[in-house]
Amino acid sequence: FSLCKAGKISVEECLNKLTHANGWCDVSEDWLRENNPWQSIESLYYGYKLYDPSKTFALQEDLNLINSFNSNKQNREFHYHLEVPAEPWQGNPLTANIIILSLNPGWKEECNKDHALQLPVGRVSEGIFAEKRNSLLFNVHGFMPQDSLFEDFNKLGDNYWEKRLSYIKEAVPEMDSSEFYQKFALVQYCAYTSEKYGGGFKNNAYLPSQLFTKDLIRHIVYHRPDVKFLILRAHDKWKALLDNDVWYAMLPRIISPKPNQYRNQ
C-alpha cells in the first residue's frame, strides 16, 4: 500500500496485489473452459424433456448439500428443483458487456413444468436444450435465441427477462435484437431453481459450483475492464462470495437499480 500511496503503482495494480483466501491467482479464459464443472453433465442437456423427473440436473459435487438442504426444509417452496435444467448463467458471460448478477432461477409450475411438457417434440424442445447446453459451455452469442425458439424459450422463464430488458431495448431503437441481446449475460448466485430462496447451506458452506462462479467473476473483473455489472438480487451474498479484491475492483462498475425494483425474481 505504501507504493500505491506514493503514486509508484496504480490503484488497480494495488488491488491486484491483494490476496484472497487461497492466495492471489489469475483466472484465464482457457482455465475456465478447461475446468468448467458443468461439462460433466452436458450429456443431460440433450433430448426433448425440459421437465424430466427421471433426471437430476445437478453437479455430483453439489448434490450432498442440495439434498441435505431440501430434506431439512419442510416448506417445499424453498426446495431446489433438480428435474429442470440448472442455469448457472444465461447468455455468454465471457463476451457480454453487461453482466446481470441475480440470486437463483425462479420456479413457476405453469412455466417450468406445464409449458415444458406441452412443447412439441422435435426442433423446438431440442433447440431449447441446445441453447441451454451451449450456454453452459460458453458457446452462445447472445442472451436468448433470436429465431423461432424465442417465444417458447422465454415462456419457460415466464417471460421475465424479456420483459425486464424490454425497457432498455426501447431506449435504443436503432439497435436490432441480435446486437442488443449480445450485450447481456445473467449469472446466478445459485444455479438451481426454487419457488422461493430458502437461505444458505449448513455451516455457511458454498456449493462447488458457486466457487467456480466466483472464479468466473474474478476473470471478468480483471480481464474485461469494459464490463459493467448490474446486481439485481443478493447484493450482500455476492459481496460475501467474492474475494475482497474482486469486489472492490467491481464497485466503480456496478450499476445500481432502484430499491426493490426487481425484488420478485
Predicted region positions:
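Low-complexity, serine/threonine/proline-enriched polar segments
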Residues: 118-191
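Short linear motifs at secondary-structure transitions and domain/linker junctions
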Residues: 72-78, 160-162, 204-206, 242
